[in-house]
């Protein structure tokens, strides 16, 4: 039986409009099971419900119906002591750092331990451990105004780890950072996951974040989970239109003038590759073996952690029987051949 650390069951959240009796659903019947030790991404467009879902997971927002179980125990039980014990198992990393400007780095990290009545001796020991862990040993007595964005987020991560949480909740942890700093923060999160078996949930709209470190991903659209699975499977073979749109696999990145000027007798096709397939001369093989014309409109190669993946949008024309043979050839190579128009 799989060890699920977090189980979200039929979770819904609606907000009642003050000016009327009508309500709007922010979340609708969310079902998710997140394994222990997983780096789990939740992605979606703005307004999809990501932030509301995170607020429910950390207990700041009560659902209209449904439940969230942390290690088998309900997050919404009425016993204050039991609820406090569950919430102490979670640490929170914020988009805009949320550091106290009047406190030093060490004092910011100490804050969760102070409100948890942890002894001063233990606090000092833990602060030193965490500073070493996030690579800020030399910044202990520095104030946040003297830190870079990446350093501030490292302080935020250290603070979130202060009370030895089992779960790290990250709300857009890299969206305020430049690409190089983003990679270093994601690498730190991956190292924490590997070293401590920490379960990490990342709310993000940045596909690169999910590509770089997430094991599994859920796609949220209009308050509903429309797709969920291993990152490679979801990104290479998306099933839902919302996912395809997020990943730019519906042809929306092809210049409008090319779409308007294209010959309607030609097929607009997406070719999807992974691993060694991306290294093969597929286009030249199609042209030579099947006597068809293939015109590349857009696309390129990318990486999903250590796996090469590629997507090409091409126009294909030729005799129908030759195109059918080419499609069969692509299928035999396990290359995605999806007709867009």
Swiss-Prot record:
Its EC number(s): 7.4.2.11
TM regions (residue ranges): none
Keyword match Membrane: yes
InterPro entries on file: AAA+_ATPase, ABC_transporter-like_ATP-bd, ABC_transporter-like_CS, ACT-like_dom_sf, MetN_ABC, MetN_ABC_transporter-like, NIL_domain, P-loop_NTPase
Localization in the cell: Cell inner membrane
Highest taxon in the source lineage: Bacteria
Any one GO cellular component localisation term in the record: plasma membrane
Domain ABC transporter: 6-247
Membrane-topology annotation of the record: Peripheral membrane protein
Example of a GO MF term: ATP binding
Binding positions for ATP per the UniProt entry: 44-51
CDD domains (alphabetical): ABC_MetN_methionine_transporter
Name of the top EC class for this enzyme: translocase
Quaternary structure note: The complex is composed of two ATP-binding proteins (MetN), two transmembrane proteins (MetI) and a solute-binding protein (MetQ).
PANTHER family: AMINO ACID IMPORT ATP-BINDING PROTEIN, METHIONINE IMPORT ATP-BINDING PROTEIN METN
Function of the molecule: Part of the ABC transporter complex MetNIQ involved in methionine import. Responsible for energy coupling to the transport system.
Family the UniProt entry places it in: Belongs to the ABC transporter superfamily. Methionine importer (TC 3.A.1.24) family.
Name of this chain's protein: Methionine import ATP-binding protein MetN
Lineage: Bacteria, Pseudomonadati, Chlamydiota, Chlamydiia, Parachlamydiales
Gene name tied to this protein: metN
